Amino acid sequence: MATNAKPVYQRILLKLSGEALQGAEGFGIDASVLDRMAQEVKELVELGIQVGVVIGGGNLFRGAGLAQAGMNRVVGDHMGMLATVMNGLAMRDALHRAYVNARLMSAIPLNGVCDNYSWAEAISLLRHNRVVIFAAGTGNPFFTTDSAACLRGIEIEADVVLKATKVDGVYSADPVKNPDATLYEQLTYQDVLERELKVMDLAAFTLARDHNLPIRVFNMNKPGALRRVVMGENEGTLITKEVAAVTK
């Protein structure tokens, strides 16, 4: 597909997994990966795109194992929320070092560390081309950061949620386990539900579906993939309400 002269999106919600930040380290934050992502976000800002970001916390804390060992789920989820704030602080710092204006907002009050989440303030910042990082998930336990990404995407009236992953999009099966798995170019919400494809958890996905929020799944590890997505190229998998499923 020919590259469009202008971006096809005006405002996006970028969902990054915490694992994406750890690079090859296996834990924590890889500074080189963080800086590369900041540069890619900077490219979008320079294209005039308004960018909201939600980051997971799996690189710093995984509550599932501790929950199995007896930890209260609410406590574990609160710890996970704090992990997303730590990632948000790192991303804000990386963006500032790249000379990008960025604001970090938390769904739980952390005075002196970052701003409290405010819908009106977030909209104002986005309109002034500031990157807004939304941390601490939804502020409630039992909800994933994918749910937070869809919720914030709906609230800020984003054109699309861009879900960055470690694979090239949505496949018919796990491409790591099955090399013959098919990569889908386009799917409908119904396709995903009927085929039980793993895009995100059901609560997050149905939230996006009910509010007709498109989702684009792509590989953030591919250099330039994010830019190609916003310029309308065939990168990753697009999930919408009415587009007929097409496979590569």
Swiss-Prot record:
Catalyzes the reversible phosphorylation of UMP to UDP. It comes from Yersinia enterocolitica serotype O:8 / biotype 1B (strain NCTC 13174 / 8081). Keywords: Allosteric enzyme, ATP-binding, Cytoplasm, Kinase, Nucleotide-binding, Pyrimidine biosynthesis, Transferase. Belongs to the UMP kinase family. Transmembrane segments: none annotated. GO terms for cellular component: cytosol. It is found in: Cytoplasm. Gene3D superfamilies: Acetylglutamate kinase-like. NCBIfam families: pyrH_bact. One of its GO terms (molecular function) is ATP binding. The keyword Transferase applies. Homohexamer. Pfam families: AA_kinase (PF00696). This is Uridylate kinase. ATP binds at K15, L16, S17, G18, G58, R62, T165, Y171, D174. It comes from the Bacteria. Signal peptide: none annotated. Pathway: Pyrimidine metabolism; CTP biosynthesis via de novo pathway; UDP from UMP (UMPK route): step 1/1. Allosterically activated by GTP. Inhibited by UTP.
